[in-house]
A protein has these predicted regions:
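N-terminal/domain-start segments enriched in small and hydrophobic, helix-friendly residues
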Residues: 6, 16, 71
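Short, low-order "capping/linker" segments at domain edges
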Residues: 91-98
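An amphipathic, aromatic/His-enriched active-site/gating alpha helix that lines ligand/cofactor pockets
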Residues: 23-36, 44, 54-88
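Short, surface-exposed ligand-recognition loops at beta-strand->loop->(often short) alpha-helix junctions
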Residues: 9-20
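Short glycine-/aliphatic-rich beta-strand segments at the starts of folded cytosolic domains
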Residues: 2-10
Length: 98
C-alpha cells in the first residue's frame, strides 16, 4: 500500500531547506526509498511550508528513516525551522486521476 508523509514546518530560510533536501538526495542516491518529494509554500501563511514525500509502502518509509543520512538531515532541518515540525503519516487508500 502506498504511503505518504506530510511534514509541515515554519521557516524564514526556505532556500536553505531546499538545498539541504538536494544534499540529502545526493548522499542517499541508489539507497533511499522515497519516490517523490514536493515542497510547497502556504499562500496564506508565507513562512509555512509543507513537504509531501511519497513512498511505495510504510515499510519502505521506515527503511528510509533508518539511513544515517536521514538522521543527520532531520537534525539539520530542525535547525532551520522556527518551532517544531508537524508530521502526518498517511496510508494511501486510493488514487484517482482527475
Amino acid at each position: 500500500m502506498p504511503f505518504i508523509q506530510i511534514i509541515e514546518l515554519r521557516t524564514t530560510r526556505p532556500d536553505e531547506v531546499e538545498a539541504l533536501v538536494k544534499e540529502w538526495q545526493a548522499q542517499t542516491a541508489g539507497r533511499r526509498t522515497a519516490q517523490r518529494g514536493t515542497f510547497t509554500q502556504d499562500r496564506d501563511q508565507p513562512d509555512t511550508y509543507v513537504q509531501i514525500v511519497e513512498f511505495p509502502s510504510y515499510e519502505d518509509a521506515m527503511s528510509n528513516s533508518y539511513l544515517p543520512e536521514t538522521a543527520s538531515f532531520a537534525e539539520r532541518l530542525t535547525g532551520l525551522c522556527n518551532g517544531p515540525m508537524e508530521f502526518r503519516n498517511l496510508d494511501v487508500r486510493s488514487i484517482e486521476e482527475m
